[in-house]
């Protein structure tokens, strides 16, 4: 798109994604005040080029003008662009939220904008890429309700409502009801299919989730967020070759994408290939918004027993912490303390853990259902020698989130429990929990989230107290 004074030129190309072959191109010139009409004209022209027969509903969707305010639509598109990135990071979710809030401020009747705001808030609540407070959950609900009130048959509003029930309430039956309604209005929407894949994944229906991901990718083969989520399913299932193949697809579309390279590194760690992980992580220069990526670099240094450089990096970041990260500041300080402990600086580690505990506890009152935060506190108390508090917190997390309710992240508290039990003198409980974890797919609580593997049991120093136990040795060195 090119802009000159009050005129805009839009250059459009139609490319067959499967073969990257050129099918059609054209140029559209419009006044800036009429820019929104281009979208309808382009959609109709593409349908003609593809000789697609549009249903009445589809013609109405194409003809609809989502807002009469070009600035609101511009903000909406900027927010949407953040949501189409590969990962739900604080940086991406905060960026999306900022622009979409501006869109609905500029046009309070912008139903599509309200629907996207609900989706941004709900996904941020679920993934903790936004601070998962009751206020955020309420904002997601109100935005979805506003979108439906403004346009009751808007597919994106139905999608947002379904996603709210899925992400904020874990009410999967109601979520499916709305997603299926959205699918009838938007039969070719990859976001609806992705939503269905998400719900089935949390239900533990991994094969059904896989089928929805495959359908979505046929519709939208260059959607890197979709491809990344599909890859993460493979990671949780420990199907690492398939995950890596999917990540290569992403890198062909967005070369050098940081979140994709970090996930490749975590797979290498999970497979016990630390040199390969190091080669992927070494070139990355990370801002503070890349929390998972930073933690993956620290984890690499811990696994290698070479934490010196990352200690200096974390100290610099935490000297002036970004308060928009919320509880992640305390989580990063936990990682600093762990690195200091591995480096042998026990007094500095204890000081950092004490500060981390204070920072994390300050968020617990307004985020009482944040299982990630509770897990962080359990590990921090464990490190400080408060075994009773550590175990109480781990068991609190387990009571809040079960594997039966959430097959994807429900096992996370068990991962925390295994670590706490290993370090607090309860090897029987640690090993029985590890046996269960190694037998199921899940998204782990630490760094970029691959589940525990035999290789990680061998490398992770948190399991050092179990090293001489024959039962642990059997888990860490399984026979082929």
Regions found by a protein language model. Give the residues of each.
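Terminal, low-structured helical/coil segments at or just beyond the last alpha-helical repeat
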Residues: 451-480
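Sterile Alpha Motif
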Residues: 412-445
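Hydrophobic, well-ordered secondary-structure elements that form the walls
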Residues: 378, 418, 430, 466, ...
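Low-complexity, Gly/Pro
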Residues: 365, 372, 419, 474-480
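Acidic-histidine catalytic/liganding microenvironments
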Residues: 107, 151, 440, 460-463, ...
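Acidic, Ser/Thr-rich low-complexity linear motifs
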Residues: 62-65, 130-131, 323-327, 362-370, ...
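TPR/TPR-like (Sel1-like) alpha-helical repeat modules
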Residues: 285-289, 354, 395-399, 431-442
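Acidic, proline/glycine-rich low-complexity intrinsically disordered segments
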Residues: 1-340, 345-369, 374-377, 386-389
């Amino acid at each position: 798109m090119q802009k000159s004074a009050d005129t805009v030129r839009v250059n459009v190309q139609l490319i067959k994604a499967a073969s990257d072959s050129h099918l059609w191109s054209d140029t559209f010139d419009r006044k800036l005040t009429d820019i929104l009409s281009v979208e309808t004209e382009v959609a109709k022209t593409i349908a003609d080029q593809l000789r697609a027969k549009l249903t009445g509903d589809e013609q109405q969707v194409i003809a609809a003008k989502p807002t009469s305010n070009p600035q609101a639509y511009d903000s909406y598109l900027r927010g949407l662009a953040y949501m189409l990135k590969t990962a739900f990071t604080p940086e991406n979710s905060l960026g999306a939220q900022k622009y979409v809030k501006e869109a609905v401020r500029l046009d309070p009747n912008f139903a599509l904008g309200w629907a996207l705001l609900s989706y941004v808030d709900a996904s941020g609540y679920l993934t903790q890429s936004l601070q998962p407070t009751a206020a955020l959950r309420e904002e997601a609900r109100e935005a979805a309700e506003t979108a439906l009130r403004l346009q009751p048959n808007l597919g994106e509003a139905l999608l947002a409502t379904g996603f709210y029930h899925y992400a904020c309430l874990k009410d999967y039956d109601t979520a499916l009801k709305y997603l299926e309604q959205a699918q009838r209005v938007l039969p070719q929407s990859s976001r609806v299919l992705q939503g269905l894949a998400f719900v089935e994944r949390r239900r533990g229906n991994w094969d059904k989730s896989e089928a929805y991901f495959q359908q979505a990718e046929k519709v939208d083969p260059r959607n890197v967020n979709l491809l990344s989520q599909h890859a993460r399913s493979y990671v949780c299932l420990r199907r690492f070759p398939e995950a890596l193949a999917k990540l290569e697809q992403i890198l062909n579309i967005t070369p050098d994408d940081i979140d994709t390279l970090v996930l490749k590194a975590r797979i290498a760690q999970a497979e016990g290939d630390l040199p390969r992980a190091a080669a992927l992580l070494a070139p990355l220069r990370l801002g503070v918004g890349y929390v998972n990526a930073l933690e993956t670099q620290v984890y690499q240094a811990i696994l290698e027993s070479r934490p010196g450089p990352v200690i200096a990096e974390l100290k610099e970041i935490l000297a002036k912490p970004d308060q928009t990260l919320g509880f992640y500041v305390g989580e990063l300080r936990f990682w600093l303390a762990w690195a200091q402990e591995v480096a042998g600086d026990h007094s500095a580690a204890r000081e950092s853990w004490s500060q981390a505990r204070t920072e994390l506890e300050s968020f617990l009152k307004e985020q009482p259902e944040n299982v990630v935060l509770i897990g962080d506190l359990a590990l921090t108390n464990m490190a400080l020698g408060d075994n009773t508090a550590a175990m109480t917190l781990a068991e609190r997390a387990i009571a809040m989130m079960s594997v039966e309710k959430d097959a994807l992240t429900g096992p996370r508290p068990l991962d925390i429990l295994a670590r706490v039990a290993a370090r607090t003198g309860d090897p029987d409980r640690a090993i029985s929990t590890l046996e269960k974890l190694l037998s199921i797919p899940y998204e782990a609580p630490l760094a970029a989230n691959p589940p525990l593997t035999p290789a990680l049991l061998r490398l992770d120093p948190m399991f050092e107290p179990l090293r001489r136990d024959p039962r642990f040795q059997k888990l860490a060195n399984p026979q082929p």
